[in-house]
């Protein structure tokens, strides 16, 4: 209403339009707020609720588009309110992606967040004397940045970080708030993500090239014939998240209709493992999610557990060494108070309450289980007993790293980096800080050949445990196994990796002569080093007839700067549970 106009002066149809809009707006807020109370596990418990929420927001969005003029004049609809609705829809798609692992929903979230910025929905917020509205804008920027990071839109991330920095500076100058340090921390966390890769790839004009490390079609070695923390998102979790996803279809080329927030066509369905991401969980939280994942696991599927945390070592000696006597990984720190009471100092024979011991995973070996442990006590998980005869494999990180090539926790774990991008990890381990685009492409092409050879080594070995072959039929697990073997071979040839504790291990143990110490694989690693001109970082085994001189003409020298990694600090517990299955998740209709 405007001026002296009363409600009775408004035509009945327009009054009904405002009433219907208010109803949809209230209903959408009610449903959206209810999402936080839903458990993250159990499809049946949350999928229908998400469907209802999507439906109401779709109606609300279309309704405000169709009746914008009436809502502007009669309701006083402001552009930031439209932006808030669009932001909520973006959040819906992002959280649906987290629950389903369907990367196409990231594109949907990006389309809404992008349109908010393009149409300056939050532009007028800075002119309002209401700090809570500015906070809405800052939170929008933070969410938009997370989505862009997951889509590897690094150039846009840098622009958004600059804009967010300016917005935070303006916000803290205008309002005397207590959350200034919190927002500055957000900026620092984003900057750490942007600078996390220890090696950059450069074009001819010295501009940085950004690559996605999600699985591409044809990027996994073929099977042989007849074979069956930004926003609590740490860099290691970010890398494993992408290692367990396929590249979204038409990610770079998808266009959007003019004047609408809807894409031209619905995103194509892709098969990705359903994942749960846990940051510093308590043992009870971790066990709850493990149990839910185990219960939901379809037939012919496997549960993957990725653990990245500080190692907990046994405090005393026991005559009987069982599955709880080798320590494990610490799931949560600073847990000195239990049920309101301060914990007394533990007896040496007592176990750490918030340690995940190998024995804690025994109940879940009733179904196929694939475990990755990145920790200073990873080898505790070699002490498994396959009680139920189901396929079981554990890939275990080095326990220690050489002092001069230490794993820098701020930039993530070297072991996880190998599972995410072997070429990035290899280049970093050998001291490279930058690589030219042409050389990078040739090295990646060479690695594809290496992966095929590793795949043949595994599938043709007569002494390998059958568990590896049973998991080798899945594309994601096959790629992880191949990268693990390459990592093990590369570390064994590096001059500074000399302790046995500095090498990755596995349960069951891989036949070394057929895989990680194969002369063919060793030759491939040395060839890659020659290609990158980092021969000085590796040693040729005395048993291998290999001449560096033969390769120098094949791979000419390329000048490059060097970078050594800094000291690693203690890890904070990160857990990723993934259900590797070919079962599709039904698509929500918009």
Each PLM stretch: what is its role?
Residues 245, 343, 439-588:
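C-terminal functional modules of predominantly eukaryotic multidomain proteins
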Residues 206-353, 372-375:
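A domain-level signal for caspase-like cysteine endopeptidase catalytic cores
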Residues 60-80, 119-132:
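Flexible helix-coil transition and linker loops at the boundaries of alpha-helical arrays
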Residues 370, 374-493:
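Active-site-proximal C-terminal subdomain of hydrolase catalytic domains
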Residues 35-53, 94-109, 150-157, 419:
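Short coil/turn connectors between adjacent alpha-helices in alpha-solenoid helical repeat scaffolds
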């Amino acid at each position: 209403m405007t001026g002296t106009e009363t409600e009775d002066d408004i035509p009945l149809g327009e009054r009904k339009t405002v009433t219907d809009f208010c109803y949809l707006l209230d209903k959408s807020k009610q449903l959206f707020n209810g999402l936080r109370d839903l458990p993250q596990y159990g499809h049946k418990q949350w999928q229908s609720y998400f469907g209802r929420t999507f439906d109401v927001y779709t109606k609300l969005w279309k309704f405000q588009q169709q009746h914008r003029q009436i809502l502007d004049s009669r309701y006083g609809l402001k552009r930031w309110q439209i932006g808030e609705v669009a932001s909520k829809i973006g959040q819906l798609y992002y959280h649906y992606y987290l629950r389903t692992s369907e990367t196409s929903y990231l594109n949907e979230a990006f389309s809404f967040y992008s349109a908010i910025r393009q149409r300056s929905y939050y532009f007028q917020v800075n002119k309002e004397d209401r700090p809570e509205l500015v906070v809405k804008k800052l939170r929008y920027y933070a969410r938009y940045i997370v989505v862009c990071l997951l889509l590897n839109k690094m150039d846009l991330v840098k622009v958004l970080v600059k804009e967010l920095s300016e917005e935070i500076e303006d916000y803290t100058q205008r309002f005397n708030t207590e959350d200034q340090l919190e927002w500055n921390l957000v900026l620092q966390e984003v900057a750490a993500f942007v600078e996390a890769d220890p090696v950059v790839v450069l074009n001819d004009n010295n501009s940085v090239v950004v690559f996605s490390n999600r699985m591409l079609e044809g990027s996994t070695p073929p099977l042989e014939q007849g074979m069956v923390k930004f926003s609590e998102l740490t860099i290691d979790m970010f890398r494993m998240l992408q290692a367990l996803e396929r590249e979204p279809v038409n990610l770079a080329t998808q266009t959007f209709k003019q004047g609408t927030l809807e894409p031209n066509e619905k995103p194509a369905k892709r098969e990705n493992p359903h994942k749960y991401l846990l940051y510093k969980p308590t043992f009870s939280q971790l066990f709850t999610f493990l149990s839910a994942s185990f219960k939901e696991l379809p037939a012919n599927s496997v549960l993957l557990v990725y653990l990245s945390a500080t190692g907990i070592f046994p405090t005393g000696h026991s005559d009987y060494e069982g599955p709880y006597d080798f320590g494990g990984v610490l799931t949560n720190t600073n847990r000195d108070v239990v049920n309101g009471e301060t914990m007394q100092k533990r007896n040496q024979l007592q176990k750490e309450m918030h340690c995940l011991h190998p024995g804690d995973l025994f109940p879940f070996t009733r179904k196929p289980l694939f475990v990755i442990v990145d920790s200073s006590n990873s080898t505790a998980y070699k002490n498994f007993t396959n009680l139920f005869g189901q396929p079981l494999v554990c890939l275990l990180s080095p326990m220690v790293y050489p002092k001069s090539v230490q794993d820098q926790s701020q930039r993530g774990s070297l072991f996880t980096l190998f599972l995410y991008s072997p070429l990035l990890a290899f280049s970093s381990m050998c001291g490279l800080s930058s690589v030219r685009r042409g050389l990078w492409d040739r090295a990646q092409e060479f690695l594809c050949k290496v992966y095929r050879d590793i795949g043949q080594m595994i599938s043709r070995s007569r002494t390998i445990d059958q568990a590896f072959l049973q998991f080798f039929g899945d594309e994601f697990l096959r790629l992880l196994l191949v990268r693990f073997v390459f990592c093990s071979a590369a570390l064994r040839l590096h001059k500074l990796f000399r302790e046995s504790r500095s090498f990755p291990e596995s349960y069951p143990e891989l036949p070394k002569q057929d895989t990680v110490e194969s002369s063919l694989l060793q030759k491939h690693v040395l060839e890659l080093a020659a290609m990158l001109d980092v021969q000085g970082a590796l040693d040729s085994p005395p048993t291998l007839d290999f001449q560096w001189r033969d390769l120098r003409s094949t791979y000419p020298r390329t000048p490059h700067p060097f970078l050594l990694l800094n000291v690693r600090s203690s890890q904070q517990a990160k857990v990723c549970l993934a259900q590797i299955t070919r079962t599709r998740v039904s698509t929500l209709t918009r």
